[in-house]
Amino acid sequence: MADIQDSGCGRYDNPGYYTGIIDMCAPIPLHRQSGVPGKVPGALLVARGIKNCIPLLHAPVGCAFQRKVNPFRPWDIFFDTPCSGITEVETVYGGNDRLFNAIKAVAGKYRPDLVLVISTCAPDLIGDDFESVIREVRKEIPCEVIYTTGNARRQPVGVQDALTSVIDQLVDEPAEKLEHGVNICTLPAHNATFKIAELKALLEEIGAQINGIYFIDSTVDQIRKLSRAKLNITDTRQEWCRLAENKFGMKSLALNQFQFKSLDDSPGTVSGTVKLLQHIARELDLGEPAYAAIERKKRQVENELARWKEKLQGKRIAMTFFLHGGAGSIMVKELGMECGVLIIKTPALSRSLKRESVEEMIRRVVDFIQRHQRSEPVVLFDPAPEDEIAAIKQNNIDLAVCGLNAVNLSAYLGRGIRVFDEGRFTRHHVRVGFEFVLNLAKEVARVFDRPVSRKTLLSLLDYSSGKERPHLTEYWANIAECFQSVWFCDVCECAGEGGK
C-alpha cells in the first residue's frame, strides 16, 4: 500500500455545531493571502461539498502541510487529506506509479464514493499523465475518480478548477431535460446550509422543478444528474457554468448580478426578491401562474413586515458603508429607519479599487439613502474612533449598525450606544428570499427590547487608536498592517524608486 498521510479523524457535518464556533472564530484576522482561493484550498472546498468524497493531494508532503484549516472557514477542518508524498525520485522519473498506488490506497482505506485528485506545481511541471493513470486505476477500484490540474487553461482558482473538472469528468449527458428544471448551486464556504431552504421553497411555489442543490453534501449520483436542469442559479459568476452551457446547453443566473445593478434590487429586499423570482419565471417560461404566486407571496410578506415597521419606523441609525448596501441600507428602505450618520472607511477600498470606482460606489449609497428618507445623513470619511463616537452622540442616534470596519462593539457599548452586530447577523441569517428582511426586523426589534450593557469583558482590552482597525487590539492591528503592507506593495512603484 502506498505511504499516504492523513489525520485519521472523522468528519463532522452537523450545521448546529457551527453557530457558536463560527462566532468564536470569525473575528480572527487572517493574512490576506491565506484567504485567496488558490489551487489546493479551493479544490478542498469543493471536495468538502461532495458527500463521501476524499481529496488526494498528489504532491510532496510539504505542499500538503497545514492544509487542515480552511482559510475561508477557520472554524472548519479538513480532517481527511491524504497525500501521495512524491519525492525527488518522482520529480526525475515521474509520479505516475506513485499516484496509481496512492489512489488504490485511498480507495481501500476510506471506501469513498469519489476520490478527487488535486495536483500541485511539481507533478504539473514534470507532466504526470493523470488521464491515463485514472483510466487504469478505475479498473481496480469500486469508486469514481476525477482529477484537477491547472494545465487545461482554466481559470487558475482552485474552486473553479475543481468544479470545471466535476462538470467535465463526472456529470453525465442527460437522457431527458426537466421542463422547468433548476439547480441551486453554492458552496459550504458561503454558509449555504443556512440560506437555501427558503429559495428552494419559493422556486417550488412558483412552479419550478428543483433538480438538485449543489454543492453542499451532494452525492455522486446527484452530481451525475446535474445536467437535467435548464438553469443553474449560483451565488456569483462561475467559470464552470460556461462549460455547462457549452456542453449541456444550460443557462446560468448569478445572484450577485442583482446587487451590482442597484441597491434596490438586492435579493435581501422585498422588491429585489420579487424581481429575482420574476426573472427566474421568465427564464423557465413558467407563465402567469408563477407571477400570480409571486404577487401573493409579496403581499403576505409586506403585511407581516408592516407590524415590525410600525415599531421601528423613524429610529435613527449610524451605519458604515458597505459595498452592496448591507443591513443598514435595508433598514432604511424596508423598515423606514433613518440614517443619521454614514461612516465611510476608504483605505480598505482604495487598496484594491480605483479611486473613480470608490467614489462611484459611495455616490450610489448616498443617493440610495437620500431617495428613501427626507433628511441627508452626516457623512464621515475615515474618522478617528473618538470622532465617530462623538458624531453618533451629537446626532441623537438610536442604533449603531456595526460592521467589521466599525469601532469595536464594546467601545460603543461602553459609551452607552445601542449596537446591532451586522457581522454576526450576516453570518447566520444571510439568505436569498423574503426571510432575510423579516429576520432583520425581528433582530433589530430584539436589540431595542434589551437594555444597553456598558460593561463587557471585551471592553477591558486596549483597542487600536488608529482609524483603519479599531476593532483589533494594538498588537493585532500592527500585525495586520504589516501583512497588508507586504501584500499590497506596488512593485512598479518600488522599482521606480531607484529601480530596486
Say what each PLM segment does.
Residues 1-500:
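An N-terminal assembly and electron-transfer interface module characteristic of large anaerobic redox
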